[in-house]
């Protein structure tokens, strides 16, 4: 970690009512003396002139000084809050840079200083960027929850439980005559099962948080001419796909990225699924299945004029059986304008069934509300936290080590191997908060931040 004193504009570039220059590091007091003529009283707003080297006034505004470690970065911090014209701010940065030993901050470097000085853990630092980039109230609230430590608290709790269990197992190993009794008395198994249950809950919440941040991938799939492209157009609000009465019109994957009340949704229209000898259509169908395998949700599009069935296993058992076991399915019975079906929403064999007319728009709004609900949209904006893909991967890795540990306990009564799996689980979880994290990963994370954060 560098000990350089860094400076950057903390407000967005361009014209604004207020512009803020932030300085962090040991030389912040030197900057204060050079630009202000004095060091402001700690944590007090000091209205004063900002002067150049000749003593001429560049601007007037508020100076704030925070003495480390009681600051955002943990270093001495000086903020100069002046008028928001870009020329004025550039002049002020130029003046600050005349003080020996300063340099311009890299993107995210103020937050990186805070992380390195234990003012934030890595999930909280990432939440700052997520809060800035939030595209909905739900995403903003979830990012704020992460910034305030909701995600971190759950991870720290898991790490503590895993560590305590590991110490208990290692204590049993230290007394080999009693090791088997320790491993078979039920206490370790009960603790391990409790941790597994806790981790499952955190994984579910994290997956929801990832969808709020990154969006949900929804694949529209079904037989040819079921109305898949019409539904894509209805959801997108524009004519993205060509629609004809000819079965097999869509031969490739079509993508649309939309927002429902600010929440990102990635909709994918696919070629109609059927047996075909057409080479191009075959490639399109293969691509459709590739998209289905990585989807968060499948909208199973059914032409309501061809069947009255609502159970997806009855409609097309081969299609349902081929889907990944963990993939959620929503049945969409289309062409309700022709069948005269009631637009009610029902449940069948564990699946939601929607009746719509993609052509006229009947029932599409209800389907949008359903998709918002699946993405975690909450009108009361309570609860939840933001999660990133790296968090999900770390949680999956931790879970796999726990499962291997259970096997070592239940099948082999192997205390040393159980302890090792618990150690690996602990390390995977600790990577989330940054306790065990490579410099390359830190660089990648913080370089995506705004300059000045």
Swiss-Prot record:
Residues the record lists as binding GTP: 225-230, 244-250, 269-272, 334-337
Keyword Magnesium: yes
The keyword Transport is assigned to this record: no
Listed EC numbers: 3.6.-.-
Origin: domain of life: Bacteria
Residues engaged in binding (6S)-5-formyl-5,6,7,8-tetrahydrofolate: 22, 79, 119, 453
Any one annotated GO CC term: cytosol
Family annotation (Pfam families): MMR_HSR1 (PF01926), MnmE_helical (PF12631), TrmE_N (PF10396)
Keywords: Cytoplasm, GTP-binding, Hydrolase, Magnesium, Metal-binding, Nucleotide-binding, Potassium, tRNA processing
Compartment list: Cytoplasm
Note accompanying the cofactor annotation: Binds 1 potassium ion per subunit.
InterPro entries, per database record: G_TrmE, GTP-bd, GTP-bd_TrmE_N, GTPase_MnmE, MnmE_dom2, MnmE_helical, P-loop_NTPase, Small_GTP-bd
Binding site for Mg(2+): 229, 250
Oligomer and partners: Homodimer. Heterotetramer of two MnmE and two MnmG subunits.
Protein family per UniProt: Belongs to the TRAFAC class TrmE-Era-EngA-EngB-Septin-like GTPase superfamily. TrmE GTPase family.
Name listed for the protein in its UniProt record: tRNA modification GTPase MnmE
